[in-house]
Every structure is written in C-alpha cells, then in structure tokens.
Design a protein with these regions (language model features):
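Low-complexity intrinsically disordered segments
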Residues: 92-140
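Residue-level signature of the C-terminal ends
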Residues: 20, 24, 64-67, 107
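Short, hydrophobic/amphipathic alpha-helical patches that form generic packing surfaces
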Residues: 52-66
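Helix-start/N-cap signature of alpha-helical segments
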Residues: 46-50, 93
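Short, solvent-exposed secondary-structure capping/transition elements
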Residues: 63-77
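Short amphipathic alpha-helical segments and their helix-coil junctions
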Residues: 24-46
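Short, extreme N-terminal segment that most often corresponds to the first beta-strand
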Residues: 1-21
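Residue-level detector of well-ordered alpha-helical segments, enriched
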Residues: 29, 33, 49-56, 99
Length: 140
C-alpha cells in the first residue's frame, strides 16, 4: 500500500475509494463500503485495503454530519463531493452511524491487517490517535 500520511485519505486505497465516490450522488457507496467491511466481523479478519477504504468511508460520513477532520489536498475530492451532496440529504441516518462505529472498532481490533501494518511502523501511535479522534468526533 502506498502510504504518505496517517490520515484517512493518505494512502492509495483511500484515494482510489475517493475517486469511485465521485460516481455516487447519495449515501449508497458509503453504506456499501461499511457493509462490506462489517462482513469481516464473521470472517474473523479484515484485510488492509478494506480497512483503508473503511476509514475513508467513515471520515466521509463524518464530514457529511459536520464533524469532519482537517481538510487538505488528500481530502480535496471528498470535500467537493460532500459539498455537492450534503444539501440533498434529508436527515442523519442512525443505522449508518452505528455501522461507522462498528467499523472503527473492527479497524482497531486484533483482526485488522491495517492495524497490524501500522503497528509495525514508527507511526502507529499517530495513526491510532487519528482513528480514535475520528471515533470521538462521531460520538460528539
């Protein structure tokens, strides 16, 4: 995985996901990503690409709720998409919020390859802090 930052959009998988998001005009793509990741709750292992996409999806959901993290060049495409779609959303969906929380728990768990890869790097604590900040923002 090409990674250049600990943020949710600082890797190739997340950037590819964000590119695909541009084709969507509603919450379907975000929810589909979360549903795919949650299948790992039963398969016992979450592979890194799905973990990276999950973080991108949850951060995008967070931005739609007005609880987004820092904007930067890595998030620019997502930020444009959020600005276009946000006004069209009728109300927050508790089911997606619940899925987002479950996904973050899974990404941080022992069953996450993404967590394992970050654990083997010198930036693990920074990455973990980024994910726990996202959890905090979702809960606010």
């Amino acid at each position: 995985m090409g990674t250049w930052a600990v943020g949710p959009f600082g890797n190739d998988f997340a950037q590819d996901w964000a590119q695909d998001l541009q084709e969507s005009k509603d919450l379907y793509f975000i929810e589909d990503t979360l549903n795919n990741v949650l299948q790992a709750e039963t398969t016992e292992y979450l592979e890194a690409p799905f973990g990276a996409e999950a973080l991108a999806a949850v951060e995008t959901w967070s931005r739609l709720q007005g609880k987004g993290g820092a904007k930067d060049e890595d998030s620019a495409g997502v930020d444009e998409w959020v600005a276009d779609v946000q006004a069209k959303l009728s109300k927050p969906r508790a089911d997606i919020a619940d899925k987002a929380h479950r996904v973050l728990t899974l990404v941080l768990s022992e069953a996450s390859e993404l967590r394992e890869l970050w654990e083997d790097s010198e930036h693990y604590e920074d990455w973990r802090a980024t994910v726990t900040d996202l959890q905090r923002r979702l809960s606010a």
